[in-house]
């Protein structure tokens, strides 16, 4: 038991001091998985891409499956973070909509290849299925709660029940994000159009500048 604690302490200390190497491994793993798939990809592929030794890999991750799970959690957190809009007036639905929709679309476009792999793994891996469900459902339910708060305060008159509206807008964002993944130059136009559609469906009260 003491040996286990010592090993964990060493690993934790190195996590703090060598965070850049861990970050490179994560970025490399996402690129390798996107190119090769989870099955064919190897630890050697990841370390070569990251320019980190195999020994360095095992300081942070026990296997390629573990780093894949860490990536899945990171994607989930990226979508949740897209709904957090620091520096934006949360009482302004227009500003919140533009910022959060832009962040969500950008995150989905960036992680699209990995999302496809996550969906595949979710069919056979219960732990991955739970993560996949969180990726899809947590942002939607959080968005629905936000719509309800706006409605209760008289700042919105949504065209549908909040959860249904949140799902619909999420689907629109995903569709546009897929297009942006192939055509990045359309990002700003997409954010503008999706934001306009969302605000119309939300029945947002016009802001003071309008």
Which sequence ranges carry the predicted segments?
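Amphipathic alpha-helical packing segments from all-alpha helical-bundle domains
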Residues: 77-80, 107-110, 126-153, 163-167, ...
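Short, hydrophobic secondary-structure boundary micro-motifs
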Residues: 115-118, 130-131, 159, 209-210
């Amino acid at each position: 038991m003491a040996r286990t604690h010592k090993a964990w302490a060493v690993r934790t200390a190195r996590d703090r001091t060598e965070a850049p190497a861990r970050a490179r491994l994560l970025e490399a793993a996402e690129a390798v998985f996107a190119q090769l798939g989870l099955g064919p990809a190897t630890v050697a592929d990841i370390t070569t891409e990251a320019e980190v030794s195999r020994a360095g890999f095992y300081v942070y991750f026990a296997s390629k499956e573990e780093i894949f799970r860490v990536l899945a959690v990171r994607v989930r957190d990226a979508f949740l973070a897209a709904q957090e809009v620091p520096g934006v007036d949360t009482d302004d639905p227009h500003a919140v909509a533009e910022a959060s929709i832009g962040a969500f679309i950008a995150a989905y476009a960036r992680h699209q290849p990995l999302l496809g792999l996550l969906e595949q793994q979710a069919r056979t891996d219960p732990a991955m299925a739970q993560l996949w469900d969180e990726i899809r459902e947590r942002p939607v339910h959080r968005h629905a709660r936000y719509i309800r708060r706006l409605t209760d305060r008289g700042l919105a008159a949504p065209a549908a029940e909040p959860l249904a509206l949140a799902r619909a807008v999420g689907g629109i964002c995903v569709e546009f994000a897929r297009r942006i993944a192939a055509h990045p130059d359309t990002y700003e136009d997409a954010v503008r159009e999706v934001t306009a559609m969302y605000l119309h469906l939300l029945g947002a009260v016009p802001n003071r500048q309008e």
